[in-house]
Structures are given as C-alpha cells and as structure tokens.
Amino acid sequence: VVEAPVSNKNLVVEPCRSDFLVAIVPPGHPKANQETVNFAEIMEYPFICREEGSGTREVILDHVCHAEGCEDGLNVTMELGSPEAVKGAVEANMGISVVSRASIAKELKLGTLVAIDLDPPLERPFSFVHQKQKFRHRAMDELLEFARSYCKSHPEAV
C-alpha cells in the first residue's frame, strides 16, 4: 500500500481510498478550538514533520508550495522518522503537524491530540501496488483480494 503517485510501467496501481490529512495540536493549543485551519495559519507555529523522502512530507510540502509559495514555507523545527514520533512531539507541545486522520484515532479517543480540518482539504490516494507479471503467486492474489475486500467493507479505516 502506497500513499504517493507511482509512475513505473512495470507496476500495477489499484486505488483503494482517499486519505485525508489534518492538522494536529495538543488540547491546550490556541488553535485547538478551531474547526478548520489553513497553511498560512500553520506557518505561524513551529512545524514538526516527517523525514525527507516521506510520502506525507512530500504531499504537505507540494501543497504548501502551490498554495502559499515556497519562499515563505513552513517553520520546520523538527524532522522525525515515524508518525508515532511526530504525534509524541505534538503531544509534548513542541509544535503543530499535519498527519493522516486515520493515524490518530487512538490519540483522539484518549484526548491527547486535537484534529483540525485543513482549509482547503488535503487528501491523497492510497493504492495497492504490485508487479505486472504473467505468472502470479496464489498467495499474492489472495492477499490482494483480502485487501480489496477490506477497503470496500471498511471505508472509514485505512
């Protein structure tokens, strides 16, 4: 499963669903009571992001460059190697971040993070990717069928 566009002729890309990105802040943050936030507002705060090469980071930076202009950019104060590390830094009030809504279900339930919808919304496709092959393994076909079925029966989950 990948969250970025794939342009390799030797691969088959099957869309699964859209993933919506949201801003996250700790509960006491000045933006915590807002329903929506735009990137111009996010740029006012320290920004915590994933490491270079991360699909999430690329989507965010591409969006900021097109919407707000790269010359201003985000005030990146930390680059971390996992979604869990990003969420932990935001919970510790070290800055704001933008993550997949699906990745913060536990934190929202526990009340350790607040999700704020982005304006305009920012979404990315989640797709299954596999090699084009004349001869495919049965196990791979069964896994793909299971994943397709799961996506259809759980539209809210990723």
Spans of model-derived segments:
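Short beta-strand-centered segments that line the small-molecule binding cleft or hinge
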Residues: 1-21, 25, 33, 91-94, ...
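Hydrophobic hinge/microswitch elements
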Residues: 3, 53, 65-113
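Structured beta->alpha junctions
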Residues: 5, 52, 78, 119-120, ...
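Short alpha-helical
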Residues: 7-8, 54-55, 84-85, 103, ...
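Small-molecule pocket liners
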Residues: 11-13, 18-23, 27-29, 37-39, ...
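Alpha-helical segments flanking ligand/cofactor-binding loops in enzyme cores
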Residues: 14, 40, 87-88, 141
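Secondary-structure junction motif
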Residues: 31, 47-68, 137-138, 153-158
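A late-sequence structural motif
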Residues: 114-157
